[in-house]
């Protein structure tokens, strides 16, 4: 059960399931299914499987089920990795982070159901789950020895790119928080047309300010990732890890901007909204990988 040959497919399975956890959370919020099980947790409306199953209840139940399965699969992956490749420096910290943040994510979700948390607190839920996803994603990359294939294990990232990338991580995380806040405060259609309502630019209420803040952070994110991408391609053109990684990040942020704009234009089409959540999930995963590479560079300097 915990054999080394299970690591690759377990890593892929865990990454896929964690992706569905992210999408499930976005689906719950976008469809207003947060109260699909009332204030009961882990039960649903006081029962394991309630007799009355409207679509909101089905969505909330499905999200809880996928989250429970993800915890089992991630635990399986963590135990197997710890046992067989625990000698790799990053495996144990990533294992602790992935399980720890998955549990915190579940507790925040439960608290939201039972006590109806403030939306500014609920917005942290998505960011917490992204950290858990990224830890699983990184373990999977390590398991597949992606570092050796793309010479990342001998990559040295110089200080300018490290600074740009750390700032990129902070900016993206703040943008993720404002995006989650848009969902939880139901501000998706606030502040008028995209990119800005030129005939009425000044926000008028809290919903407008939340949406305005997210659009502003999204613009800063796009510009900063573009600057970082240009620097990386210009100075590391001979390294495939940097070239492919930062190119993928730039493509993902472009897709993120497009789906964000389309969400407003289409009055929050559900499919577009889910793609919006998907692209930011994998963008954050890529940034987490860059951080891993930078930490290795820092260690090599000591």
Curated annotation (Swiss-Prot):
Pathway involvement of the protein, from the record: Porphyrin-containing compound metabolism; heme A biosynthesis; heme A from heme O: step 1/1
Subcellular location per the Swiss-Prot or TrEMBL entry: Cell membrane
Reaction catalysis annotation: Fe(II)-heme o + 2 A + H2O = Fe(II)-heme a + 2 AH2
Main location class: membrane
Subunit structure: Interacts with CtaB.
Keyword DNA damage carried by entry: no
Disulfide bonds: 37-44
Pfam families: COX15-CtaA
Keywords: Cell membrane, Disulfide bond, Heme biosynthesis, Iron, Membrane, Metal-binding, Oxidoreductase, Transmembrane, Transmembrane helix
Full protein name: Heme A synthase
Residues binding heme o: 63, 125
Domain of life the protein comes from: Bacteria
MF (Gene Ontology): metal ion binding; oxidoreductase activity, acting on NAD(P)H, heme protein as acceptor
Membrane disposition: Multi-pass membrane protein
Annotated active site: 60
GO process terms (BP): heme A biosynthetic process
